[in-house]
Amino acid sequence: MSEPVLMDRFARKVDYLRMSVTDRCDFRCVYCMAEEMTFLPRQQILSLEEILQVAERFVALGTRKIRLTGGEPLVRSGVVGLCEKIAALPGLRELCMTTNGSQLDKLAAPLFKAGVTRLNISLDSLDPQRFRELTRTGDLHKVIAGIDAANAAGFVHTKLNCVVMHGRNDHEINDLLAFAIDRNLDVSFIEEMPLGIISEHSRAESFYSSDQVRERIAERYTLVPSTDSTQGPSRYWRLAEAPGIRIGFISPHSHNFCGTCNRVRLTVEGRLLLCLGNEHSVDLKAVLRANPGQPEKLEKAIIDAMQIKPWSHNFTHDDGVQVVRFMNMTGG
């Protein structure tokens, strides 16, 4: 008997779901949200039970990887229990989480016990003052303590996510890489996404391509092409000097990954986003609440939604905003 498969109209298999569990965050990163962000009222967001119901239907339809995001997922009460329930779904191979690391000093061990398989931790600077400037509120030492707690809890292939911005942190690329090597962490360098209207910097001036990052790395290390994949947008390389870790590049501008896109996103409001860089979406919250106890209705809505998944985004790295919603509203 063949496994169920979600397929879009371009014959791309969709088996990876990113689920935002909150739009709230204890940081205010300059590329992610406005400093005076207004968050959604509680009645407007999905309950944990509703999030679980969506996860159940996606896994039944062939999803093999789920990533929980935010906002900062670990500020949502009850998220560890949600992880335990999602991790237990038959057929799911990976339950991952993207976090800023601020809560990991106390939650890394419970997350590992709950069945979370991998963590991505955002880290854009190793300079405490610059880290505070980029996050507006973050404490670098607390995040590093969280990274160490993740290693101590038993997580492997923990990955650092670094958004590289010209003139802000591009000079730290190799220092971040050395930090990753020292702690046996993977790392992905990310081109800034043009989501939301920001005021801290000009995206046209701060754009730093993946090719430029590789050139900077080559000043200190030897990059070796790799066929590694985590079923996400990162294209991986290895280092001759540290072959045990993976170096990823997420390049929505310079080398977009649309042709092999295998993922969709669920916002905390219950909108199923079919593309990070477009507004094509389906309101799954409305389906859930109009049809309690009828999972087949939700399943049909998910299957039908695949037919409006676009071929690609239209990101550019000028100061034009392609998508008005901020990253924390999208699911980072």
From Swiss-Prot:
Q: Which residues form the Radical SAM core domain?
A: 9-220
Cofactors (names): [4Fe-4S] cluster
The positions annotated for binding S-adenosyl-L-methionine are Y31, G71, S122, M193
Where do the annotations place [4Fe-4S] cluster 2 binding? C258, C261, C275
Keywords, A to Z?
4Fe-4S, GTP-binding, Iron, Iron-sulfur, Lyase, Metal-binding, Molybdenum cofactor biosynthesis, Nucleotide-binding, S-adenosyl-L-methionine
Report if keyword Iron-sulfur is assigned. yes
- Gene3D superfamilies on file: Aldolase class I
Reaction(s) catalysed by this chain's protein: GTP + AH2 + S-adenosyl-L-methionine = (8S)-3',8-cyclo-7,8-dihydroguanosine 5'-triphosphate + 5'-deoxyadenosine + L-methionine + A + H(+)
What Enzyme Commission number(s) apply to this enzyme? 4.1.99.22
Output the Gene Ontology terms for molecular function: 4 iron, 4 sulfur cluster binding; cyclic pyranopterin monophosphate synthase activity; GTP 3',8'-cyclase activity; GTP binding; metal ion binding; S-adenosyl-L-methionine binding
Where does the chain bind [4Fe-4S] cluster 1? C25, C29, C32
Copy out the cofactor comment.
Answer: Binds 2 [4Fe-4S] clusters. Binds 1 [4Fe-4S] cluster coordinated with 3 cysteines and an exchangeable S-adenosyl-L-methionine and 1 [4Fe-4S] cluster coordinated with 3 cysteines and the GTP-derived substrate.
Q: Where does GTP bind?
A: R18, R67, T98, K159, R263, V264, R265
List, alphabetically, the InterPro entries matched. Answer: Aldolase_TIM, Elp3/MiaA/NifB-like_rSAM, MoaA, MoaA_NifB_PqqE_Fe-S-bd_CS, MoaA_twitch, MoCo_biosynth_MoaA/MoaC, rSAM
Q: In which pathway does it act?
A: Cofactor biosynthesis; molybdopterin biosynthesis
Highest taxon of the lineage:
Bacteria
Question: Its GO biological process terms?
Answer: Mo-molybdopterin cofactor biosynthetic process
Q: Subunit info? A: Monomer and homodimer.
Protein's job: Catalyzes the cyclization of GTP to (8S)-3',8-cyclo-7,8-dihydroguanosine 5'-triphosphate.
The UniProt entry, under NCBIfam families, shows: moaA
Report the family membership: Belongs to the radical SAM superfamily. MoaA family.
What is the protein named?
A: GTP 3',8-cyclase
| Species of origin | Pseudomonas savastanoi pv. phaseolicola (strain 1448A / Race 6)
Record gene name? moaA
